[in-house]
A protein has these predicted regions:
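General N-terminal targeting signals
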Residues: 29-30, 82-84
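Substrate-recognition element of Asp-dependent hydrolases with the DxDx(T/V) motif
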Residues: 45, 50-80, 86
Length: 90
């Protein structure tokens, strides 16, 4: 069995779109630090076809799939929101 690590941001979750549409994205102190935007990870849209692609891997017994991501240490809600995002979509 092969192991596959799947990143979230920019791979299956559209962080760039979520960042640009966030109401505080142009407000100090978030300029240049979009990862600190409150709730930015909570409602990210999936990247087109990403969910279907990962689901194919999850159903294939030849692969063990793990989601691999990180969040800023000083944005503790980001860890929870990323976990909830995975649970919602997979």
């Amino acid at each position: 069995m092969k192991i596959i690590y799947v990143d979230l941001d920019g791979v299956v979750a559209d962080f760039d779109k979520g960042r640009s549409e966030h109401p505080l994205s142009g407000v100090t102190p978030y300029i240049g630090r979009p990862d600190k935007l409150p709730g930015v990870y909570e409602n990210l849209a999936p990247i087109p076809n990403a969910i279907e692609s990962v689901n194919k891997l999850l159903k294939d017994s030849n692969f063990k799939v793990y989601f691999l991501s990180t969040a800023p240490w000083d944005n503790p809600e980001a860890w929870m929101h990323k976990r909830l995002w995975v649970a919602k979509h997979f």
